[in-house]
Amino acid sequence: HRVDRRQRQMCIRDSDKGLFVLAATSNPEAQTLQRSVSETGRAVSADIILVVSARNAEHSEAGEWGSFGFVIGATVDWTDAGIAAFAPVAPVLAPGFGTQGATPADLHRRFGSMSPAVIASESRSILSAGPAGLAAAIDARVAEYREAGRG
């Protein structure tokens, strides 16, 4: 059963939920599409952010975060991806911290003014501590993110 655009919009509006849209991931196989230039002359990643940000602006009160967020890899170079800070602020799910290369100290450097909206995602680096060391690994990483947030 195919859902048309009007039905999708009604479902989104009536559900009062949010979602994350893939915008600029660090997956090598996605870069061909996400970094390609669309008919607008911008990178597809930039177009995704512009369209979703416009939707967020239309459906959010002034000063509120948008309910549609973005997946932007923690190791993605924003300039190379053709993206920049966006408004209204929306959550950013950022996989790639830990084993994949980004550190808590990179959070502000990589995400700039958007860093307060970032949900830093890492798992392998924490899970590598094993069952006995898991709680200590989580506590240590939380302390690193708190310290990075003060900087």
Regions found by a protein language model. Give the residues of each.
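Short, well-ordered secondary-structure micro-motifs
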Residues: 9, 31-34, 81-83, 104-105, ...
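C-terminal alpha-helical cap/extension of soluble enzyme domains
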Residues: 88-151
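Single conserved hydrophobic/aromatic residue that forms the stacking wall/gate
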Residues: 1-12
